[in-house]
Curated annotation (Swiss-Prot):
<keyword id="KW-0963">Cytoplasm</keyword>
<dbReference type="Pfam" id="PF02545">
    <property type="entry name" value="Maf"/>
</dbReference>
<comment type="function">
    <text>Nucleoside triphosphate pyrophosphatase. May have a dual role in cell division arrest and in preventing the incorporation of modified nucleotides into cellular nucleic acids.</text>
</comment>
<dbReference type="GO" id="GO:0005737">
    <property type="term" value="C:cytoplasm"/>
</dbReference>
<protein>
    <recommendedName>
        <fullName>Nucleoside triphosphate pyrophosphatase</fullName>
        <ecNumber>3.6.1.9</ecNumber>
    </recommendedName>
</protein>
<dbReference type="GO" id="GO:0009117">
    <property type="term" value="P:nucleotide metabolic process"/>
</dbReference>
<keyword id="KW-0546">Nucleotide metabolism</keyword>
<feature type="active site" description="Proton acceptor">
    <location>
        <position position="77"/>
    </location>
</feature>
<dbReference type="GO" id="GO:0047429">
    <property type="term" value="F:nucleoside triphosphate diphosphatase activity"/>
</dbReference>
<comment type="similarity">
    <text>Belongs to the Maf family.</text>
</comment>
<dbReference type="InterPro" id="IPR003697">
    <property type="entry name" value="Maf-like"/>
</dbReference>
<keyword id="KW-0378">Hydrolase</keyword>
<dbReference type="InterPro" id="IPR029001">
    <property type="entry name" value="ITPase-like_fam"/>
</dbReference>
Length: 215
């Protein structure tokens, strides 16, 4: 009788709590969390979608080059944009406020670049996907903008807002994957894992081990 092949361990190339939570929703607990420290500065005239997929690939390939054992590396990068204008991952109150003002009353697009690399016997197999979601915020009052900024939940978030937090109350329209806006499109993630031989229906939880990239 043919034995079922054991799944390779999963490495998540991100310390994002949202991405960890999303993987947990589909019963995947990474064996390791290894944040990939890369330069995320957009290239000159780089558009949002190419930026997201490039950064996801760079994260995944960096971790693949650092590990010796066989594993599957999941990396993602999320970019919010109004038209061709890439919004920053806000780091200050003022950046959050500027982003929310720009999003108020209009549609924006959220792109997540997904890159999954299977490393086995020093051979790399790569799966890449760019996923787009359209989101529209209602017209926000100054009071709503100031209140949201006071929550600090938009700090370090693409476009200055946490879609699974209070900002969800601002959404009047959404088209596409909700998990994509949170940072990891689950439908595409499962499809990519399955294509690499990972059996998502027979996942054995593993103890989570937090690691950091070598500096």
């Amino acid at each position: 009788m043919k034995q079922n092949r054991k799944n390779l361990p999963i490495i998540l190339a991100s310390s994002s709590p949202a991405r960890i939570e999303l993987l947990n929703r589909i019963k995947i607990i990474p064996s390791q969390i290894i944040p990939a420290d890369i330069d995320e500065t957009p290239n000159l005239r780089e558009l949002p979608a190419p930026l997201a997929i490039r950064l996801a690939y760079e994260k995944a390939i960096k971790i693949a080059s650092q590990i010796e054992a066989s594993a599957i590396i999941i990396a993602a990068d999320t970019v919010a944009a109004v038209g061709r204008r890439i919004l920053p991952k806000a780091t200050t109150y003022e950046e959050v406020k500027n982003c929310i003002k720009m999003l108020s009353g209009r549609r924006h697009r959220v792109y997540t670049g997904l890159c999954i690399i299977k490393k086995e016997n020093d051979q790399l197999t790569v799966r890449q996907k760019i996923v787009q979601t359209i989101v529209k915020f209602k017209k926000l009052s100054d009071e709503e903008i100031n209140f949201y900024c006071s929550l600090d939940e938009g700090i370090d978030k693409a476009g200055g807002c946490k879609i699974s937090g209070y900002a969800e109350a601002f959404i009047s329209f959404i088209s596409g994957s909700y998990s994509n806006v949170m940072g990891l499109p689950l439908f595409e993630t499962v499809n990519a894992l399955t294509s690499l031989g990972f059996r998502c229906s027979s996942i054995m939880p593993a103890k989570m081990n937090y690691c950091h990239s070598a500096t």
